[in-house]
Amino acid sequence: MADSKLKIDIRRDRILEQLRQKGKILVSELSRELGATPVTIRNDLDALERDGYLVRIQGGALLRARPSVEWRGEQETIAHLAEKQAIAQAVAAQIPDGSTLFLNSGTTSQCLANALRAHRSLNVVTNSLAVATELGRQPLIHVILLGGEINTQYGFTYGSDAEEQLRRYQAGWAVLSVDGVSARGGVTSFHAEETAIDRMMIAHAKHTIIAADYTKIGRTGFTHICDASPEIQLITNSPCSPEAIHDLELLGVSATIV
């Protein structure tokens, strides 16, 4: 039986995670770790190469080199772009003009920045270079970019300086792009250095929206941001796992599927 689109996307996301961590991956290792045939893994690598994520080599792949002046999202292809744009539009529809909001880094946050461009009198506090660049061009949106250390691969700031600055602010909304949302694991990320920023954004906001495409639902990342609870509103898209959504709703999470 052919793989479902959800299964394929999750597997390819995991391949990319390993590639970003190691810089080089082998078909034999991926086949063993992901429980897929070598032919399936090679097809995945070929597809990811076409999308611009990697360079194929004999027996595996290398992370595609990028100029050091770029950050993720500036010129990189965004996986599941249409889905993330739909989620971003749904989030933007809930943010009134005149709001103050926190935005973290991530490709869904970048899509939200694009969706917010027509808003008026927004105050946006972010640690994302791409979000700050996009919204900073809009004359009716005031942007504060948190200072601190820079993750040059993914284009976000973090560390004690960024956290100290964030402590000064309160917001109506915290909108977070994350790597996993599940009843058991809660809201999670693969970027440990950014987790403290994410937690503080939630603590200093009246409302929290988790914007995550369907591949993140039922999945658990490396570091814990917060529990799944009634304080969280989740906006995601089909074809997310109905079982995972049901389990989240049992914990009081408000889930919207666009």
Q: Where are these predicted regions, by residue range?
A:
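HTH-adjacent hinge/linker in prokaryotic transcriptional regulators
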Residues: 2-35, 39-102, 113-119, 125, ...
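Glycine-rich beta-strand-to-loop/alpha-helix junction loops that act as flexible
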Residues: 104-106
